[in-house]
Amino acid sequence: MATKHILIKMKQSSPLQKGLITAGLMILASLFSLYILKNPVESYFQIIIYVIFSVGIVWSMFSYSKSVTDKKSFSNYFSIGFKTFIVVALLMTVFAFTYFSLNPEFRDNKIAENSRKLILEGSHLQAEIEENAAQLKKMFIPMMLSAAIFRYLIIGAIITLIAAGFLSKKNYKVL
């Protein structure tokens, strides 16, 4: 019996491993969308990225539900999901930093679009518009990274809460 327990433990991958796999799939899907399909960063393809993210979290928690441990409480499920989505959020933030650093034209297009809007408003001086563009250029990457981190943390927490609530029900039977 002890040997079976050890083999099952060895076959299970950790939330870290599942987070790495999930983030890898998300990065591959992002690269496919950006470079093969030529979608803009803010396309509807992002929904697929979030579905992969959600499935990765649930996969990690569901795998834990099949483990032989008796400690299957809401907090344990949440802990597994949390560890998974934190790894994904970290790697996706690194990916976003890398992408935006290597593709400054995305930043420049956003700044130009913002400047056009300010010109059309007609209530800004040219010097104000240029100063605004310079400020946006300085804070663009930190702003985009903050938004990415916040998005992944919020979505990850929501998915984890829902899945932990479902999986921790006493009458829930794992297939």
Model region roles, listed by residue range:
Residues 94-123:
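Functional transmembrane-helix hotspots
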Residues 134-157:
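Individual transmembrane alpha-helix segments
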Residues 13, 17-21, 79-91:
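Alpha-helical transmembrane segments of multi-pass membrane proteins
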Residues 2-8, 168-175:
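Short, charged juxtamembrane terminal tails flanking transmembrane helices
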Residues 62-77:
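Membrane-helix interface/capping segments
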Residues 25-33, 53-57, 88-96, 155, ...:
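Alpha-helical transmembrane segments of multipass membrane proteins
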Residues 118-140:
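Short membrane-interface loop/juxtamembrane segments of multi-pass integral membrane proteins
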Residues 2-63:
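Transmembrane alpha-helical insertion/packing segments
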